[in-house]
Each structure stands twice: as C-alpha cells, then as structure tokens.
C-alpha cells in the first residue's frame, strides 16, 4: 500500500469502492483479481463513509479503514483512500471519479463494481456521465450470472469466496 504521491506515475487507475462492512476474503480476492486483470493499473480502494443505497454501516468508518489498512499492507500497487470517509456523508460515485480524475489525470480510469450494482447502475447519480468517464470492471455475484448490460465492461471471474458482508453480519446476529 502506498501514499497518494506514488500514484502519479500510473496512466491507468482503478477505483474499488464499497462499505467493507466488514472486510472479508472476497473483497481481498477482488483486489487480487483486479490487479491481475489490469497489470499496469494502480488500484485505489475507497471505503465509503455511507453507501447511498444501504442502511448505516455496522462498523464505524475509522474501524473499517483500519481493517483495510492492515489487510492491504505490502501491496505496492494498492492505495487506500479516505476521500469519501472525510466527506462524512454518502458520496455519489461520480463525485469520487471526478475527484480522482482531476487529482491524477489518468489516461484510463476503471471502476470495479459487482454484477448486482451493474443491474441498477442507471439509478446512480449522473450514471450517463459516469459511464463516459470510466471503463467498468465487473465481478460476478451469485444470483447475477446473466448480466443485462448493453455497454462494454471487463468481466472479473474466479472469485471463489462468497461475497456478502450482509450475510456475515446476519450470521453474527447484527
């Protein structure tokens, strides 16, 4: 994991945002697979202060950030950003995309999302503008195998771990 300045030499950036509530092995598998799919990209992991489509987080933002910090140590192509957490509100993805495009001016900016998010992407703030600014990297989710999306995206396959923080919270009775 690196500092913000280390990103400047990368022409390709990828953003992977989420609640990470809690962080689990599928999140880490997605990070590994994204780095493999995009060998020249720097990956910015972007924990949300609050996901605009979900109820408030179980774990506070500081705890989630620290969990990610520990898990991402020793990953030189990964940057952990607190941009959304510092806003102390739900931040639309387009706002984060514009922020990182202005900050680093990458030639290509990828957005890593789940197939479940792709299904309702049209309901996101300024979705049309978002799709003009990014290339999508979409990871599989159980129950979303048949993606109905007319645009181009890079499929991210081979995530063997179940991907559900909400299922983990439910098993803990939270």
From Swiss-Prot:
EC number(s) stated in the UniProt entry for this protein: 2.7.7.18
Enzyme class name: transferase
Pathway(s) per entry: Cofactor biosynthesis; NAD(+) biosynthesis; deamido-NAD(+) from nicotinate D-ribonucleotide: step 1/1
A Pfam family: CTP_transf_like
A Gene Ontology BP annotation from the UniProt entry: NAD biosynthetic process
Reactions this protein catalyses: nicotinate beta-D-ribonucleotide + ATP + H(+) = deamido-NAD(+) + diphosphate
Keywords: ATP-binding, NAD, Nucleotide-binding, Nucleotidyltransferase, Pyridine nucleotide biosynthesis, Transferase
UniProt cross-references to InterPro entries, sorted A to Z: Cyt_trans-like, NadD/NMNAT, Rossmann-like_a/b/a_fold
GO molecular function: ATP binding; nicotinate-nucleotide adenylyltransferase activity
Annotated family: Belongs to the NadD family.
Function: Catalyzes the reversible adenylation of nicotinate mononucleotide (NaMN) to nicotinic acid adenine dinucleotide (NaAD).
Protein name per UniProt: Probable nicotinate-nucleotide adenylyltransferase
Biological source species: Helicobacter pylori (strain P12)
Gene behind the chain: nadD
């Amino acid at each position: 994991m690196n500092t913000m300045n280390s990103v400047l030499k990368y022409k390709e950036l990828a953003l992977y945002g989420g609640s990470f509530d809690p962080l689990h092995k599928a999140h880490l598998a997605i990070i590994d697979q994204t780095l493999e799919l995009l060998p020249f990209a720097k990956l910015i992991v972007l924990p949300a202060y609050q996901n605009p489509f979900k109820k408030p987080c179980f774990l506070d933002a500081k705890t989630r950030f620290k969990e990610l910090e520990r898990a991402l140590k020793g990953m030189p192509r990964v940057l952990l950003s607190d941009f959304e957490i510092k806003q102390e509100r739900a931040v639309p993805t387009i706002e984060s995309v514009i922020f990182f495009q202005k900050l680093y001016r990458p030639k290509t900016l990828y957005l890593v999302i789940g197939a479940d998010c792709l299904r309702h992407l049209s309901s996101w703030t300024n979705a049309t503008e978002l799709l003009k600014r990014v290339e999508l990297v979409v990871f599989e989710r159980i129950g979303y195998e048949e993606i109905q999306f007319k645009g181009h995206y890079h499929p991210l396959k081979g995530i063997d771990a179940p991907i559900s923080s909400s299922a983990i919270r439910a098993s803990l009775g939270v």
